[in-house]
A protein has these predicted regions:
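Terminal amphipathic alpha-helical/low-complexity segments used for targeting or macromolecular assembly
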Residues: 1-6, 11-12, 17-18, 54, ...
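Structural signal for interior beta-strand "rungs" in well-ordered beta-sheet cores
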Residues: 2-188
Length: 257
């Protein structure tokens, strides 16, 4: 363990072996930090916050502070962060609120570029990339392998499915299904994220099936109910379509159209 003498580590904080804390960083009393995590200079980790192993928190990032919600009344809500995440300069991750489940969750192996923001009660999966100034409002759910390009804004309570790609300066106001590239202000479905899927090991046939599902939902002029029925039929023999169908069933803000 290496703690710069100019850092402030409150009594009660639990730091595992191999943790590094830089100059003028502040660690709160209810914080737990896993093995090998690096807290950079001037970073703040506070509140009821748990970071797993090998995370990197760069200078001036703020993890676990109070939610930006007028209804918040000081309840001991939490932030739970997995392993191998990178939080670059000025990233903010706020803890949850009692009006929801009281917790903000971040999975593993995510990259949060400078000045990106994860609001209260959000759930972020694993292997995601948040480019500079990508911003989540409260209660947003993000799947795995999602990319949010720079200046993306996501409205509260929206869901974005795994392997989706959101283009820069896009305003997401509805739910974005898995595999989709969305672009615009407000966001509209553009195409399938075929390049990303290929990089992650999807076969040519699987990508073709997903493209067919996209056409059924967005290019066939079918009523939504009929399109979903056809997708369910396809999912019976094409497992890669199952997440697509399940996501539609969980959508609460309607889908991008």
């Amino acid at each position: 363990m290496s703690i710069d003498p100019r850092a402030v580590v409150a009594e009660g904080a639990k730091l595992a072996p191999g943790v590094q804390v830089g100059a003028y960083a502040i660690i709160g009393p209810d914080v737990e930090i896993g093995e090998g995590t690096v807290i950079g200079p001037h970073a703040v980790v506070t509140g009821w916050t748990r970071l797993g192993a090998r995370n990197k928190v760069f200078q001036f990032a703020s993890i676990g502070d109070a939610p930006q919600d007028k209804k918040y009344a000081g309840e001991p809500t939490r932030v739970e962060i997995g392993d191998d995440n990178v939080f670059r300069e000025y990233v903010t991750v706020n803890r949850g609120t009692a009006k929801d489940k009281g917790i903000t969750r971040v999975g593993d192996d995510n990259l949060f570029m400078a000045s990106s923001h994860v609001a209260h009660d959000c759930v972020v999966g694993s292997h995601c990339v948040f480019a500079n100034l990508a911003t989540l409002a409260g209660h947003v759910e993000i799947g795995d392998h999602v990319i949010l390009a720079g200046f993306t804004g996501v409205h509260q309570f929206c869901k974005i499915g795994s392997h989706a790609f959101i283009a820069n300066n896009t305003a997401v106001t509805r739910d974005v299904p898995p595999y989709i590239m969305a672009v615009g202000h407000p966001a509209e479905p553009h195409s399938v994220n075929a390049t990303g899927l290929s990089r992650r090991g999807f076969s040519t046939e699987q990508v073709r099936n997903i493209k067919n599902a996209f056409r059924t939902l967005y290019r066939s002029d079918l009523p939504l109910e009929e399109a979903v029925t056809r997708l369910r039929e396809a999912a019976a023999t094409q497992p890669e379509i199952v997440p697509f169908v399940e996501f539609i069933g969980r959508s609460t803000r309607s889908l991008v159209r």
